[in-house]
């Protein structure tokens, strides 16, 4: 088929041929009847609708009706996707040729085209070609197909025939790059199965198609530039997947991937292309419930070059509602497990459009295991994953990734094959193996390896063994051929042998494949096929990946993003949840992976070098976003090659950005089987890594995961601890850097000085001491403490010297920066203190005062008293104490005489002086003290005053300002 298709689509396929020249992969697929059974059945069903080829493809048709429905959905999706390919026009011609040639082949090509569509953009060495085909075809066909599903089908078939050499490229581009892939699939389906034309309702609008076309063209350019570097690598992978074997297993897997969610869940419900934004780089498996307008993929661009496609929560929700799991369970039990997973997979791809960022983060949510798996450069592996892990969201994501610019990201693709290991069941793994063998092996050939962009093969550390590590299943052998991309898978696979979806190590590519790092973190999550899809490309992470994690609500899938994640590490760590798709063991591994994924994404070198590379890869892009989360060790857990539950490095000190940790929570709970402990970086996948997730995992999840039971508490504890640690780190940082408001030393103690503010002394009533504040402080601080926010003992850091020696009370040790604001109300009456705190961000000044605020207040009072008042020596020195004598007796007598002469009475009061403090008339011989201002007071009265205030009670002149004029 591939040969035929190659001839059919020589100009586009030629490049893809070079890359996708994996007829042997097709052969491998055929040679793996047992493993390709699922795909075969899919193909048979699809082809049965298309042609008599159904019989040969129905070898392993577990449920023809269901398969057919699924295939219909897939075909519809493929049609939609292919419809929107740049092959649109040639697709019609090719479709006719193909129909003449082989309707079955056409169907396969359709699948392949779908795969091509998925992988084309980023996977094919001719990323541009594949992408262009995908974009143009997608755009043209979706438009054409949107109106008429039938037209889209023939065109799709033609496209498939034409694309067959790049079927996987197409399918990848469709999944990854073709935003219209959903409607294309829908449209294609309608041709073969008009009953599914309803999926056309999800078709994109013309405007969306145009947008998608533009984006695809962009990707094409970027992909071509990137693939020029990795021509054979990514193209080969895509093409390998496109190869017939790939087509029947890989492409079909992808198709199934597309179809399964819709069929399984909604029987042909196609992801509404319209729902998805053209900007969406990710193409979701149509199998997931249709992405309605409300579910449309949101594309966030941190950068014009980065597109993050976030599949609407509704869509994801449906995908993750029970169907994904139910189907996952079913899938794991049947050859079609892969298919279902693939179909159930919703692919959200973050596609850095920048050239270097040949990584596309494929945030694929597996309907079964709706996880967001950022699959960067998953397209290379994507097809194999589609094939191998066709049911794994990675398959789709991988395809998407492939469609994304990252053909070179073969790594991510490689991670996708890891997903097939689904390890839903050995059968599933076999299926994956088969798929991988047929699809991945198709990719497996040198070209297939390029699927993981060239760096994938270069990053052989994750190579073949990674598959073995991951699955120790047929996958291993099957994946080994793709050791280059498997290296990325390697971590995922070995993380959770059963985590077929452990995204290939692509995430880990960091060390191995500079370009492949996109999938690095996600792979851990990729443990589950769904997880694979949710990997966040660190590079893509700059885009908002947090939704992916949420997107994965259906599964344990961590919040894959965020992130993307950003911190992302967050996204990577969120990937950890992906493990849910795999069996308990898988989930366990995956949990660790997931944990590592997000957290480890940053903890690059956890276990295997591939993992390390992947982790590092994640780290590379994420490092800035998220400081090594100390999840890195956590990441290792899933990265542990052979042992899925290999004790991951002890949970690293969580030095990650707080933002990343949040996402760990959502998807995990939804999946019971998913054992992937969420992102926590616990050393063992679940023991440590599950720490955050366990909070969300049901007890069953916890018990299922190796250490989940312990992890859940640990996760909660870790989560709180991480938060606390982060807060503490931030606080320390701020404190260590006095320039930061928070870190500033206590509000310049000199302000606290009694004389600060020109003698506006702050008399701090006892009420102002910590006791009155303890209630509020305790409420905030202790709440934080009780929640586990036990910040490290308060560090004085560069506290003011005056404050440094004060050791905060144990209760205040945990006072977080945010807790102190409660003190402000107590200080309301003290403008001084409030002023001090105001400059410090309101809460900053508290940091310095943290535990010692009360002591500081007391100290201030003591200092204030001493400083404000005058010592007895000063009083004696600056004042004139003496015995009071009536003065001016002569003057008074003279005045009295004068008054008498005038007939006036001289008031006697004039002759009397009063002490204004006690208001008593000064009597002769009393001890009086004359201040420098010449005011006279009783010594006893004025001394008491001066002890507290050195200023004259009458004129407020400081006794130190001038020496007494009288001796």
UniProtKB/Swiss-Prot annotation:
- Residue spans, zinc finger RING-type: 915-956
Q: Where is this motif: SUMO interaction motif 2 (SIM)?
A: 305-311
> According to the UniProt entry, where does the motif SUMO interaction motif 3 (SIM) sit in this chain?
360-364
Keyword annotations: Cytoplasm, Developmental protein, DNA damage, DNA repair, Isopeptide bond, Metal-binding, Nucleus, Transferase, Ubl conjugation pathway, Zinc, Zinc-finger
The enzyme class is transferase
- Where located? Nucleus; Cytoplasm; Nucleus, PML body
- Write out the pathway annotation from the protein's UniProt entry: Protein modification; protein ubiquitination
The EC number on file is: 2.3.2.27
Compositionally biased region (Low complexity): 112-131, 232-251, 385-395
Skewed-composition ranges (Pro residues): 643-654
Primary location group: nucleus
Q: Does the keyword Zinc-finger apply?
A: yes
Query: What molecular function terms (GO) are annotated for this protein?
Result: SMAD binding; SUMO polymer binding; ubiquitin protein ligase activity; zinc ion binding
Enumerate composition-biased segments (Polar residues): 149-160, 629-642
Q: Where is the composition biased (Basic residues)?
A: 482-498
Q: Write out the ranges of the annotated region (Ubiquitin binding).
A: 880-882, 930-934
Similarity comment: family membership: Belongs to the Arkadia family.
The free-text function statement in the UniProt record for this protein reads: E3 ubiquitin-protein ligase required for mesoderm patterning during embryonic development. Acts as an enhancer of the transcriptional responses of the smad2/smad3 effectors, which are activated downstream of BMP. Acts by mediating ubiquitination and degradation of SMAD inhibitors such as smad7, inducing their proteasomal degradation and thereby enhancing the transcriptional activity of TGF-beta and BMP. Specifically binds polysumoylated chains via SUMO interaction motifs (SIMs) and mediates ubiquitination of sumoylated substrates.
**Assembly with partners or alone:** Monomer.
Q: What is this protein called?
A: E3 ubiquitin-protein ligase arkadia-C
In which organism is this protein found?
Xenopus laevis (African clawed frog)
């Amino acid at each position: 088929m591939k040969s035929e298709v190659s001839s059919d689509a020589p100009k586009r396929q030629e490049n893809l041929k070079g890359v996708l020249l994996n007829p042997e992969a097709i052969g491998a697929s055929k040679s793996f009847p047992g493993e390709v059974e699922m795909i075969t059945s899919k193909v048979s069903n699809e082809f049965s609708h298309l042609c008599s080829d159904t019989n040969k493809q129905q070898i392993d048709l577990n449920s023809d009706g269901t398969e057919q429905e699924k295939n219909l959905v897939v075909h519809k999706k493929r049609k939609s996707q292919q419809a929107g390919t740049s092959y649109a026009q040639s697709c019609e011609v090719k479709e006719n040729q193909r129909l003449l040639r082989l309707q079955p082949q056409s169907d396969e090509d359709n699948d392949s085209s779908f795969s091509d569509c998925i992988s084309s953009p980023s996977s094919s060495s001719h990323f541009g070609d594949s992408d262009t085909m995908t974009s143009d075809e997608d755009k043209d066909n979706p438009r054409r197909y949107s109106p008429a599903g039938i037209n889209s089908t023939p065109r799709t078939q033609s496209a498939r025939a034409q694309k067959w050499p790049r079927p996987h490229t197409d399918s990848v581009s469709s999944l990854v790059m073709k935003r219209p892939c959903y409607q294309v699939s829908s449209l294609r389906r309608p041709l073969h199965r008009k009953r599914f034309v309803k999926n056309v309702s999800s078709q994109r609008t013309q405007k969306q198609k145009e947008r998608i076309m533009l984006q695809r063209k962009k990707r094409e350019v970027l992909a071509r530039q990137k693939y020029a570097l990795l021509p054979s690598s990514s193209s080969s992978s895509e093409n390998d997947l496109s190869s017939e074997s790939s087509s029947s297993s890989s492409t079909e897997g992808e198709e199934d991937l597309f179809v399964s969610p819709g069929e399984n869940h909604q029987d042909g419900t196609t992801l509404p292309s319209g729902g998805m934004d053209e900007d969406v780089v990710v193409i979701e498996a149509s199998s997931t419930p249709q992405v309605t307008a409300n579910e449309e993929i949101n594309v966030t661009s941190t950068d014009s070059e980065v597109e993050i496609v976030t599949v609407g929560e509704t869509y994801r929700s449906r995908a993750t509602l029970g169907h994904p799991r139910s189907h996952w369970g079913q899938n794991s039990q049947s050859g079609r497990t892969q298919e279902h997973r693939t179909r159930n997979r919703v692919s959200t791809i973050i596609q850095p459009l920048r050239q270097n960022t040949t990584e596309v983060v494929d945030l694929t949510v597996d309907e079964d295991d709706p996880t967001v798996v950022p699959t960067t450069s998953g397209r290379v592996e994507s097809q194999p994953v589609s094939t191998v892990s066709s049911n794994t969201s990675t398959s789709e994501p991988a395809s998407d990734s492939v469609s994304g610019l990252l053909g070179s990201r073969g790594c991510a693709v490689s991670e996708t094959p890891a997903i097939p290991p689904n390890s839903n069941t050995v059968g599933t793994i076999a299926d994956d193996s088969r798929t991988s063998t047929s699809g991945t092996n198709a990719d497996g050939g040198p070209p297939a390896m390029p699927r993981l962009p060239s760096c994938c093969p270069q990053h052989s550390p994750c190579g073949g063994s990674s598959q073995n590590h991951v699955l120790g299943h047929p996958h291993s052998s099957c994946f080994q051929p793709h050791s280059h991309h498997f290296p990325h898978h390697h971590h995922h696979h070995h993380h959770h042998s059963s985590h077929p979806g452990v995204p290939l190590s692509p995430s880990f590519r960091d060390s191995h494949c500079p370009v492949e790092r996109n999938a690095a973190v996600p792979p851990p999550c990729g443990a589950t096929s769904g997880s694979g899809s949710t990997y966040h490309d660190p590079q893509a992470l700059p885009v908002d990946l947090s939704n992916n994690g949420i997107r994965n609500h259906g599964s344990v899938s961590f919040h894959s993003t965020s992130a993307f994640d950003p911190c992302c590490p967050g996204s990577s760590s969120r990937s950890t949840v992906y493990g849910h798709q795999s069996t308990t063991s898988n989930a366990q591994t995956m949990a660790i992976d997931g944990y590592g994924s997000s957290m480890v994404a940053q903890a690059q070198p956890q276990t295997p070098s591939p993992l390390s590379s992947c982790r590092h890869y994640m780290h590379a892009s994420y490092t800035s976003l998220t400081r090594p989360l100390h999840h890195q060790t956590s990441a290792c857990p899933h990265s542990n090659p052979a042992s899925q539950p290999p004790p991951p490095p002890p949970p690293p000190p969580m030095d990650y950005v707080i933002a990343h940790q949040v996402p760990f929570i959502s998807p995990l709970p939804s999946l019971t089987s998913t054992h992937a402990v969420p992102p926590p970086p616990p050393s063992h996948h679940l023991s440590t890594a599950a720490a955050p997730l366990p909070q969300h995992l049901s007890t069953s999840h916890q018990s299922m995961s190796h250490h989940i039971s312990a992890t859940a508490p640990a996760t909660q504890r870790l989560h709180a601890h991480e938060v606390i640690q982060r807060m503490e780190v931030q606080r320390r940082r701020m404190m260590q850097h006095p320039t930061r408001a928070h870190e500033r030393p206590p509000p310049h103690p000199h302000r606290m000085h009694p004389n600060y503010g020109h003698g506006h002394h702050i008399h701090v009533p006892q009420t102002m001491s910590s006791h009155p504040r303890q209630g509020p402080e305790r409420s905030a601080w202790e709440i934080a403490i009780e929640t586990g926010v036990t910040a490290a003992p308060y560090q004085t850091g560069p506290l003011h010297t005056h404050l440094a020696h004060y050791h905060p009370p144990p209760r205040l040790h945990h006072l977080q920066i945010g807790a102190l604001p409660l003190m402000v109300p107590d200080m309301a009456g003290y403008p001084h203190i409030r002023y001090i705190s105001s400059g410090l961000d309101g809460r900053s000044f508290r940091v310095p005062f943290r535990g010692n605020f009360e002591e500081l207040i007391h100290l201030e009072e003591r200092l204030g008293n001493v400083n404000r008042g005058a010592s007895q020596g000063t009083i004696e020195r600056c004042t004139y104490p003496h015995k009071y004598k009536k003065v001016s007796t002569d003057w008074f007598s003279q005045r009295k005489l004068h008054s008498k002469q005038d007939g006036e009475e001289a008031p006697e009061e004039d002759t009397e002086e009063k002490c204004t403090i006690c208001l008593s008339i000064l009597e002769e011989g009393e001890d009086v003290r004359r201040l420098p201002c010449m005011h006279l007071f009783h010594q006893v009265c004025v001394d008491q005053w001066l002890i507290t205030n050195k200023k004259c009670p009458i004129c407020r002149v400081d006794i130190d300002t001038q020496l007494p004029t009288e001796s």
